Amino acid sequence: MKVELNGVEVETTETGFLVNLEDWNEDIAKVIAAQEEIELTDKHWDVINYLRDEFINNKENQPNTRNMIKDIGKIWGEKIDSKSLFDLFPGNPSKQAGRIGGLPESR
């Protein structure tokens, strides 16, 4: 599989995750999100950037949905539940946001 942006193809796995983390940028994220029928809002970007920060700066940590609820709630300054994240990323928040964020597929 590949993602194309401005005539340049970026390689992905069979499940749509980027092969190389370094290939990611916000424009690639928008292309992947469009393929997933997601229009990115500031809240989407908060989740994507949180996951990227955890992976890049915290020993390749890929938080599960439970940890995401706790941490994203702190970022937003409000109590949230899993529905809040599934409303943003209906295909599974950690996997779908990770895919859009250019991260490897989580276990």
Residue map of PLM features:
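N-terminal first-folded block
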Residues: 4-34
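Charged, low-complexity surface patches
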Residues: 22, 61, 86-87
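Short linear functional motifs in flexible/disordered or boundary regions
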Residues: 28, 59-60, 84, 97
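Helix-rich interaction surfaces within compact, conserved domain-sized segments
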Residues: 12, 69-107
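Metallocofactor- and cofactor-centric catalytic cores in central/energy metabolism, strongly enriched
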Residues: 19, 29, 33-58, 65, ...
